[in-house]
């Protein structure tokens, strides 16, 4: 008998609700085709929660997420709530506390250049023609963003500011294992990014990654300095499979990977804890300027569902079915407005219907 799963659905603001609707259409197709027992519950978050409950992350939303196997998150924020104090605004008051509450230490950001979308890639045509499919695995809770001491002191010419890069062994070990396990589901290659020619924290990082690599003899490990990595991503992104990064370096490289795909509407994201619980969301924002117009690209939200199935529900077949359906739609020239470039475009609803149908048909 198949296991029962429960997903907490947090549509949020802007285009969040309408692209979430498309992801749930696809989830219905997955349920039917793979006979999976998956239930969902909806909760307010972000600006919608401020409007309805007076706070961006109500206790009922947190409790609902605690009772779920995973969280499918839409997007939060918009000009309507920008006048509020920073810690009460949708982004800082909802998403960051959720990450902290559930101890989400790893961030996974796939960046893929799909066949037929090479013209959107800002790289030279001969480089884009090779395509790329990269997974950036970023450590989220350690490093220079959280290390102590940090601050400012002194005055005049002696005024200074300082931050501290700190990594503990356990932090490096667990993020490295995420990267190696992910590589086993892909092309069996990990490139670990550091600055071990200068930084003590990077020397430790490299040593521990080498140790963890012995547990994965089927995965090829290479090391690369961060400055070289930023260059190699522009020169030949097809050489990479999984990038393993510290918090700071991952912050930089994940955005670079996103940019070279040419469309934020295609990029999902996953944040995981040690138990496999995850929060899955599009990498883009709430796009309030196009909200409610039925023109937003829902693919990032649908791909976020695929990540959820793969990493939190261990349903790789279902995740792959979604990815194949998206590939088929794009190969057939089906585009939302952000990808149409003057050609005929389908609506948000139509794109969701097409992908759901392809999942059901098993393309």
Swiss-Prot record:
It is found in: Cytoplasm. Substrate binds at residues 99, 109, 138, 227. Its EC number is 1.1.1.85. One of its GO terms (cellular component) is cytosol. Its cofactor is Mg(2+); Mn(2+). Gene3D superfamilies: Isopropylmalate Dehydrogenase (3.40.718.10). It is an enzyme of class 1 (oxidoreductase). Mg(2+) binds at residues 227, 251, 255. Pathway: Amino-acid biosynthesis; L-leucine biosynthesis; L-leucine from 3-methyl-2-oxobutanoate: step 3/4. NAD(+) binds at residues 78-91, 285-297. Catalyzes the oxidation of 3-carboxy-2-hydroxy-4-methylpentanoate (3-isopropylmalate) to 3-carboxy-4-methyl-2-oxopentanoate. The product decarboxylates to 4-methyl-2 oxopentanoate. Belongs to the isocitrate and isopropylmalate dehydrogenases family. LeuB type 1 subfamily. Homodimer. This is 3-isopropylmalate dehydrogenase. It comes from Escherichia coli O6:H1 (strain CFT073 / ATCC 700928 / UPEC). The lineage of its organism: Bacteria, Pseudomonadati, Pseudomonadota, Gammaproteobacteria, Enterobacterales. The gene is leuB.
